[in-house]
């Protein structure tokens, strides 16, 4: 008889993409997948391989807002009651939470029903939902070797598995890095993430304009930008005489990552792990408003290994970005060293490792 896993994930790509990678790994092992989340997930989960989806009420709150906390608590309880009713019909063998407040109702229901439970934390800093629920679940898995803000007993038993990534990204682990020739073409990829892309959309094109002419003539840029920034970015690259592809979203991000000599991006957990797996040198710009500076802590994985430079928003200008780009793009030997350092901390088989943990938990081990 096929086993069933309920995968509960928040409605952003940072939570959903690793959840999907796990789902695909479990399906390959014969499991049936049920996705539990709120209505926000619909736009991102069109390709999620779930046989069934459960929409659950959930809400978040701002720290220091007791009324908001009460409302969020009632919403989670309503969602948990709905989940318990669904679980009686589905009979899941395990419930796996990936963080974000929409994951809470399914996990609360599983905890109340004493069902096997797993939490996966994508960031180097444990998120608020996972932090609250982790002491009550059977198994905690994490992506990074350090897990800040976790209760001490939780951090001590967390299993490091890495961040599950989509198969096209996983395939890049076997592709060697080839640095640019001294006078040859140079390819720069600029990613944005779901939050805070405006800064990179506007600053990087201006920084490229400030590069020496001989470097600009060899440069090709692929950049994700917000729709409202596309015309400004195109104009800047056109003025700089730089060949550039500008789009809000690249469906074949793996292909562009494969060809890039250097990547500039935020430091979301998935982004950092993807750069490591692909073995790409990077300039990381942690989102300044990220809760608990989780992006800054994520960036340390690559920076401490020597695979990335970190540029803090409060110190970032057109000139500092231009200087960082020039120093790296004109130094192939350093790019090669950074690529090797980035790949040294990668865990490309994270989806399989997490699937092993899920199966062990379901068996009661």
Swiss-Prot record:
Annotated catalysed reactions: di-trans,octa-cis-undecaprenyl diphospho-N-acetyl-alpha-D-muramoyl-L-alanyl-D-glutamyl-meso-2,6-diaminopimeloyl-D-alanyl-D-alanine + UDP-N-acetyl-alpha-D-glucosamine = di-trans,octa-cis-undecaprenyl diphospho-[N-acetyl-alpha-D-glucosaminyl-(1->4)]-N-acetyl-alpha-D-muramoyl-L-alanyl-D-glutamyl-meso-2,6-diaminopimeloyl-D-alanyl-D-alanine + UDP + H(+)
Pathway(s) per entry: Cell wall biogenesis; peptidoglycan biosynthesis
Entry membrane topology: Peripheral membrane protein
UniProt keyword list: Cell cycle, Cell division, Cell inner membrane, Cell membrane, Cell shape, Cell wall biogenesis/degradation, Glycosyltransferase, Membrane, Peptidoglycan synthesis, Transferase
Record HAMAP family: MurG
Enzyme category, top tier: transferase
Function statement: Cell wall formation. Catalyzes the transfer of a GlcNAc subunit on undecaprenyl-pyrophosphoryl-MurNAc-pentapeptide (lipid intermediate I) to form undecaprenyl-pyrophosphoryl-MurNAc-(pentapeptide)GlcNAc (lipid intermediate II).
Subcellular location: Cell inner membrane
Binding residues for UDP-N-acetyl-alpha-D-glucosamine: 12-14, 123, 166, 194, 295
Protein name in UniProt: UDP-N-acetylglucosamine--N-acetylmuramyl-(pentapeptide) pyrophosphoryl-undecaprenol N-acetylglucosamine transferase
Top-level division of the source organism's lineage: Bacteria
GO molecular function annotation: UDP-N-acetyl-D-glucosamine:N-acetylmuramoyl-L-alanyl-D-glutamyl-meso-2,6-diaminopimelyl-D-alanyl-D-alanine-diphosphoundecaprenol 4-beta-N-acetylglucosaminlytransferase activity; undecaprenyldiphospho-muramoylpentapeptide beta-N-acetylglucosaminyltransferase activity
